[in-house]
Amino acid sequence: MTISETWMGRIDVMKPWLGEEEAQALAEVIASGWVAQGPKVREFENAFAATQHAGFAVATSSCTSALHLALVVAGVQAGDDVVVPSFSFIATANAAAYVGARPVFADVDLHTGCVTAATIKAALTPATRAVIAVDQGGVPVDLEPIRALCDPLGIMVVEDAACAIGSRYRGQPVGSNAELAAWSFHPRKILTTGEGGMLTTARQDFGDRARRLREHAMSVSAADRHASLLAPSEEYLEIGFNYRMTDLQAAVGIVQLGRLEAAVRRRREIATTYASAFAGVEGLRLVGDPEYGMGNFQSCWLEVGPTFPLGREGLMEHLASDGISARRGIMAAHRQPAYAGADTGAAELGVTEWLSDHTLILPLYHELALHDQVRVIDSVLRAAGQP
């Protein structure tokens, strides 16, 4: 423990915003006796679909499982290629591998960290069946040009909106322009259910099949089966998965969804404070809103350029010495042992590698007090050589 942690307390990079409302919602589900997937999951799905302007929503055990289901219902299979950003959590690429497809890595835009139509085009192959476009760190991806490229070619575009609940794209909720979108409710996200995810889709056939597949492809849902006195017999229509969410998780999600606007507003306030403090500091760039949308600041990531006195690693060490937790930016999946040396396409990934080497995540969460924001700012400015 550093001296700063001892005297002033540690500042974590994130904390979930949970309270008595979530505790009460959990208590009510426990008292009901129905804790597995059931009526609360359906309520959460309906509320989430309405919030995101989606036709159908299917709750899952994680965003990774939602991505897997998205590719399955889209018909992606062994022998196909799926274009994905390397600049993303490794689950994005893994989802393609789960269906036997080949992940083909695309580069990203320097300013947003997101794939573009141009970077995707550079990675397309004759075997490309799908593209996964990520809203990196909550920054919305520019989806319209990507779909304009892919739709005429019969390439399915899946939006990995893991970080983007509450973000906006051209005035609409992120994900509302996608045929398939996957969401995460991990504790690092703005809306959390502990663990969990959601698949949203504009197509009923996709939604119906994903709903079956998430519980072993049963012809009758477990909730309907257990609710019936007649105990209807079920059939298993294909090989499915156990990707269910519990009513305990969904009850928390319903409360969290009601706080979404307040959560995004608060994060943007803190990000604005950081941006104002770091404006004009040589070698620093806070990743902000693109011209076509509004981010939720699920993560507050800072690009540390070569003119910054300490570099990225030095800045992280300096922050740690002041009792402040920071994290390296997004990984480059093509550098990980799981994919290093594998045939993952021939696209140049220079921007991906630059951003992976030169970005870090600063503390940002709902209950980050003003005096702690000032501590973070003061530490960064001192590292920059400013008084």
Predicted segment positions?
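Structural detector of well-ordered beta-strand residues that form the stable sheet scaffold
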Residues: 58, 83, 104, 156-158, ...
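A short alpha/beta connector and helix-capping loop motif
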Residues: 114-123, 171-180, 375-383
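Phosphate-binding glycine-rich loop
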Residues: 34-81, 95-99, 105-107, 172
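PLP-dependent aminotransferase class I/II
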Residues: 42-46, 53-58, 118, 130-134, ...
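N-terminal "arm"/small-domain region of PLP-dependent enzymes with the aminotransferase-like
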Residues: 1-34, 39, 235-237, 363
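PLP-dependent aminotransferase-like
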Residues: 72-161, 168
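Active-site PLP attachment segment
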Residues: 176-220
